[in-house]
From Swiss-Prot:
Protein name, per record: Maturase K
Entry annotated with the keyword Iron: no
Keyword rRNA processing annotated: no
Location in the cell: Plastid, Chloroplast
Length: 515
């Protein structure tokens, strides 16, 4: 495979035209067999992997023969073994086939994605988790509307094969892919009769399909947005020298192209900004309402004609930031005006100017958080704390540590919001639920538990936010951090609250359109 990568870098045409012979190499299936055992050994005991999951090169040769014959049942090729472990071995060899197929298809995709990213330097940022927070701080407040789009999961297998055909010229190499996709499509478990491409499936083959599918959508969509979004804006220009001011304004574009590092320069001001978190792209638009309608119409037509998908209107929602809030990352996102008083002294005169800037104001969704806590049996639907009965069998330290971890995750997750007053209501619910859980365990009351454990009960478990800042900042920075917003790049992995709350929001929107 390393040799194939090296040859592919030297001659991309050879790499695209001769993928099919790789399916006839026994080493490919040995590699996929080893990779499958490495993945499955973490979920199954080793004694189950010793005798039944051995690679048989005789079976591999039968598989290669069926590939040569272009048999459309290559996934179910182990059907001649009469022993009771046939179903399990069939699954084992099916996973090996999927691993081998993924290894072959990953080679052109990795090279193509590398060159496509090198050709579009602007598109590097929106594929990283670190692009979300600069987007929220810099692009979001200066936008008028937000398009909240959703990447469709269900897609016909032939559409996926055709998208691969655009980049892989070796048509026979796509026959195994077509066979696998149709085998999955026609399986009894698949009731929708389509390929469900989701990033949460813990299979290398489906993760590869998801990555390719998203990159294909973004490459086409980003190229279209790039053509129509960039424009020169005088509002972002800098004029240190005031001589011949009006003449410089007239020739701003000419000077900025030739001497961009001199006193007169202009910046690109894209009116359309794109970022993606998981499977939810967000498009921020700065312009008139007609531009928003055109972008929304383009997204619907793009899905309909390119992927042959009929998208419901609620799949692409538009929000005006001046009237509504947008929901993303578990926040309610809105824009507020921030007045700044500027005093300028020139000679003996003092000038005072009021500048109004727009900044993002993320709001902690208290009501949805209480609803999720009620689902997890920490409180009732009205927010009244109750005991966590399923934790009464644990030790006192384990109970305190679990409540402590929940609160630290919530406080850490919503540290990007200035207004954290609502979080203290969540803190009260968790602290009282912790006390009721301990009282239920010891068959006593909250007063007795607090008297026995002392006043350090709640201080031990719910005073970690001060330590959180003191460990990461100095004394001056810790005091300043209480007045500043702090984004943490690991918040999507800390708390599944954002995904679960977003699912609730999606169901509400779908039910609204179904009525």
């Amino acid at each position: 495979m390393d040799e194939f990568h090296r040859c592919g870098k030297e001659d991309s045409f050879w790499q695209q035209c001769f993928l099919y012979p790789l399916f006839f190499q026994e080493d490919l299936y040995a590699i996929s067999h080893d990779h499958y055992l490495d993945v499955s050994s973490s979920s199954r005991p080793m004694e189950h992997l010793s005798s039944n999951d051995q690679l048989s090169f005789l079976t591999v040769k039968r598989l290669i023969g069926q590939i040569r014959q272009q048999n459309h049942s290559i996934v179910l090729f182990v059907n001649c073994d009469p022993n009771p472990l046939a179903d399990r071995k069939k699954s084992f060899y099916s996973e090996s086939v999927l691993e081998a197929l993924t290894l072959v298809l990953e080679v052109p995709f990795s090279i193509w994605s590398k060159y496509s990213v090198e050709g579009m330097n602007e598109s590097k940022s929106f594929r990283s988790i670190h692009s979300i927070f600069p987007f929220l701080e810099d692009k979001f407040p200066h936008s008028n509307s937000i398009l909240d789009a959703r990447i469709p999961y269900s897609i016909h297998p032939e559409i996926l094969v055709r998208t691969f055909r655009r980049w892989i010229r070796d048509a026979p190499s796509l026959h195994p892919l077509r066979s696998v996709l149709y085998e999955y499509r026609n399986s009894p478990d698949n009731l929708q009769r389509s390929i469900i491409v989701v990033p949460r499936v813990n299979t290398r083959f489906f993760l590869f399909l998801w990555n390719y599918y998203v990159c294909e959508c973004e490459s086409i969509l980003f190229s279209r947005l790039k053509r129509s979004s960039h424009s020169r804006s005088l509002s972002h220009g800098s004029f240190p020298q005031r001589t011949h001011f009006h003449r410089k304004i007239k020739h701003i574009i000419i000077f900025s192209r030739r001497n961009s590092l001199k006193s007169i320069w202009s910046l690109k001001d894209p009116k359309i900004h794109y970022v993606r978190y998981g499977e939810r792209p967000i498009i921020a638009i700065k312009g008139a309402h007609l531009l928003v309608k055109k972008c929304r119409y383009y997204l619907l037509i793009f899905r309909q004609f390119y992927f042959h998908l009929w998208s419901e209107p609620y799949r692409v929602c538009s929000h005006q930031l001046s009237k509504n809030c947008s929901s993303s990352l578990g926040y309610f996102l809105r824009v507020r005006m921030n007045p700044i008083l500027v005093r300028t002294k020139m000679l003996d005169e003092l000038f005072i100017a009021d500048l109004i800037t727009d900044e993002i104001d993320p709001i902690v969704p208290i009501v949805p958080i209480i609803g999720l806590l009620a689902t997890e049996k920490f409180c009732d639907i009205s927010g009244r704390p109750i005991s966590k009965l399923s934790w009464t069998s644990l030790t006192d330290d384990d109970i305190l540590d679990r409540f402590d971890q929940i609160w630290r995750n919530l406080f850490h997750y919503y540290s990007g919001s200035f207004d954290r007053d609502g979080l203290y209501r969540i803190k009260y619910i968790l602290s009282l639920s912790c006390a009721k859980t301990l009282a239920c365990k010891h068959k006593s009351t909250i007063r007795v538990v607090r008297k026995e454990l002392g006043p350090e009960l709640f201080k031990k478990s719910f005073s970690k936010e001060r330590e959180f800042y003191s460990l990461r900042f100095s004394s001056k920075a810790a005091a300043r951090s209480q007045r500043e917003r702090i984004w943490h790049s690991d918040i999507p992995q800390i708390n599944p609250l954002a995904n679960s709350w977003q699912k609730i929001q999606d169901l509400k929107i779908e039910n609204l359109f179904d009525q």
